[in-house]
Amino acid sequence: MSQSTSVLRRNGFTFKQFFVAHDRCAMKVGTDGILLGAWAPVAGVKRCLDIGAGSGLLALMLAQRTDDSVMIDAVELESEAATQAQENINQSPWAERINIYPADIQQWITQQTARFDLIISNPPYYQQGVECATPQREQARYTTTLDHQSLLTCAAECITEEGFFCVVLPEQIGNGFTELALRMGWHLRLRTDVAENETRQPHRVLLAFSPQAGECYSDRLVIRGPDQSYSEAYTALTQAFYLFM
């Protein structure tokens, strides 16, 4: 199922097959989310969970990448963001496959019996500090409402034995997140360090954990080449989504 989007619209981000309005969401569509949605392993998955859905970007990207039989649940605590995510999904080709739940993930998870093959999250990572302009943005940026240990616990409670839990984080915070996950019994299976160009140190890291032990595959992704155009690797990863790639 596909739908080509060719007209640019305001107050959001136009992709090849869908549009994400984000003017009522604290955190906008950005490179982090696009990287995670394009990178997360989807082979063989039957059921996906997006924790902290925001505008619905990750749920929509997973829907585009997976078979029509794959169901996606997306949980978002902030009511305005959840409403906008639902509107974005309703206007997409995959409305029947994505369920948006305006809920606290820690409460929502206690009511679920289903297990997920893939859990994905672009989580908050700032410690409490300078106040944000709105409570919604503070909630999206800081770990006060869902710290990393709680996030890992929630994922552990509803993942299949061979499933993957995928996140994107700043490099140093990702290293701390990995140490915490390993202490909690997770196994790191995939790691991609992301740098802006060949001369820069990685500034983001994509991580995939599993309850099941196995070999860990690591690599490095450079976003831009020497001429500042997108690299071949980044283009190959994201060209199914970016409108002008």
Swiss-Prot record:
Database matches in CDD domains: AdoMet_MTases
GO CC terms of this entry: cytoplasm
GO biological process assignments: methylation; tRNA processing
Its EC number(s): 2.1.1.223
Reactions it catalyzes: adenosine(37) in tRNA1(Val) + S-adenosyl-L-methionine = N(6)-methyladenosine(37) in tRNA1(Val) + S-adenosyl-L-homocysteine + H(+)
Short name of one Pfam family: MTS
PROSITE patterns: N6_MTASE (PS00092)
Transcription is among the record's keywords: no
Entry GO MF terms: nucleic acid binding; tRNA (adenine-N6)-methyltransferase activity
Domain of life: Bacteria
Main location per the UniProt record: cytoplasm
Annotated compartments: Cytoplasm
HAMAP family reported for this sequence: tRNA_methyltr_YfiC (MF_01872)
PANTHER family: TRNA1(VAL) (ADENINE(37)-N6)-METHYLTRANSFERASE (PTHR47739:SF1)
Functional note: Specifically methylates the adenine in position 37 of tRNA(1)(Val) (anticodon cmo5UAC).
Family designation: Belongs to the methyltransferase superfamily. tRNA (adenine-N(6)-)-methyltransferase family.
Protein name (record): tRNA1(Val) (adenine(37)-N6)-methyltransferase
Organism listed in the record: Escherichia fergusonii (strain ATCC 35469 / DSM 13698 / CCUG 18766 / IAM 14443 / JCM 21226 / LMG 7866 / NBRC 102419 / NCTC 12128 / CDC 0568-73)
Lineage start: Bacteria, Pseudomonadati, Pseudomonadota, Gammaproteobacteria, Enterobacterales
Gene: yfiC
